[in-house]
């Protein structure tokens, strides 16, 4: 049913050039890379005309809102995953950003731009390296193939993702070696001050 509802909006809705959808861990989280990208979108005047939607699971909506408010960030739209509003956002946003994968029924429309930041450095087995889980890599591969940009913090991560998900002959997109957005925390004076106060 979810797939049918989503496809309906994919076919019907035009792309909104000023809408950005952000999702972390299929809506299970709302921090990490997604938080730092959202923060930039909210605080940088160059993006004042854009609407940023963070998609989270129903039980996470209140804690996500409280988290962003505690950081002094307002203007974010929180959307519950697997709802009408979610399907509409996914089907109409010009820009799609995920640190994992979108749900299996996701289809990228022509004209949409997808940035995948992944969410960590692969120090554990992934993809085909997980012997008893190879049947589950299809959705991850699909998301990587759909991505216009794949962001990695280092060549180790990039090479492992390409190898473990067998992307070499599948992906013809752009690999960005620019570090993870969440690593800006190491250079943020406010964050440094908060940590010192908390642990002093």
Regions found by a protein language model. Name each.
Residues 2-4, 121-127, 139-200:
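A nucleotide-sugar donor-handling region in carbohydrate enzymes
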Residues 35-39, 44, 71-141:
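Extended catalytic core of nucleotide-activated donor transferases of GT-like folds
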Residues 54, 114-118, 165, 169:
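Tryptophan-centric aromatic hotspots in well-structured domains and transmembrane helices
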